[in-house]
Amino acid sequence: MFEINVDPVAFSIGSLVVKWYGIMMALGVVALVSWIFWRIKRGANISYDTVLTAAIIAIPSGIVFAKLLHVIDAWEYYSLNPGAIFSGEGLTIFGAIIGATIGLWIYSRYSHFNLGYLLDVAVPGILLGQAIGRVGCLLNGCCYGEFGGTGCSVIYTNPATAAPYGVEVAPTQAYEIIFLLCLLTFSLFIAKKLRPDGQLFLLYISLYAAWRVAIGFVRVNDDFALGLEQAQVVGLILMAVAVPLFIYRLRKQKQTDKIT
C-alpha cells in the first residue's frame, strides 16, 4: 500500500486556483506539440505553420468535446450546477480525442494536408501527453479504482483529495500510466512497419479503446448504459470503427506491396 498526501491545489494567486491536474494537462499538450516539432526537425513532411494552426484548432475542439461527454455522463449533477459546465475539471479523454480529430478533419478539408500522416506522426506524442495527464489524475485523486486492500493499493490522506479520504483504492491511474508508456514504446517500433496514412493512429485508437473497456471493470464510475461506464461504451464504439478500418488499410498496403 502506498500513501499519497498531496494537496490537489499546486498554488493560488488571489482568486485564481491552479491545480496539479491542470498543470499536468497543460504539460501533456506541450509534450505532444514538442514531439511533433521534433519529428519535423527530423524530417517529417509537415510544416510548422500547419502544426501551430492544427493545435489552435484541436485544443479548443478537444476541450469542448471532452467536457460535452462528461456533461452527458453526469447530467444530473450539471443540471443542478450549470455553472460547473464551464469549469476546467470533468474532462474525458475520449471526448478530447474525438473533438480534436473532428476539428483537424475539418481543417484538413480546407488546408488539404494529409490528416492521416499528421495523426500518425502525433501518436507517440499523444501517448506521452496522456501519460503526463494521468499523473495529474493520480495526484488529484480522481479516476481511482475499486475499494479494498489489494496487494497494490493507494490511500489518499489529504483532506482536499478527490478520492475517498483514508480509504484504500486501486491506483488505476498508475496502471494506465504504465500501459500508455508501454504502448508508446510499441508505437515507436511498429510505426516503421506501417504506411503513414492513419494506420498507426487507428491502431492506437483500437488498443487504447480496448484498454479502457478492460480497466473500466476496475475503475469506480457510475453505469452509463448496459451496466458499463461511459468510457467503456465509447471504447466499444471506437473499436467497432477503428479495428475494421485498420485491417482494411493494412490489407490494402499488403496488396500494394505485392504489386510493386
From Swiss-Prot:
The keyword Transmembrane applies. One of its GO terms (cellular component) is plasma membrane. Keywords: Cell membrane, Membrane, Transferase, Transmembrane, Transmembrane helix. The keyword Nucleus does not apply. Disulfide bonds: none annotated. Pathway: Protein modification; lipoprotein biosynthesis (diacylglyceryl transfer). Its EC number is 2.5.1.145. It holds the Pfam family LGT. It is a multi-pass membrane protein. A 1,2-diacyl-sn-glycero-3-phospho-(1'-sn-glycerol) binds at R134. HAMAP family: Lgt. Belongs to the Lgt family. Catalyzes the transfer of the diacylglyceryl group from phosphatidylglycerol to the sulfhydryl group of the N-terminal cysteine of a prolipoprotein, the first step in the formation of mature lipoproteins. This is Phosphatidylglycerol--prolipoprotein diacylglyceryl transferase. It comes from Dehalococcoides mccartyi (strain ATCC BAA-2100 / JCM 16839 / KCTC 5957 / BAV1).
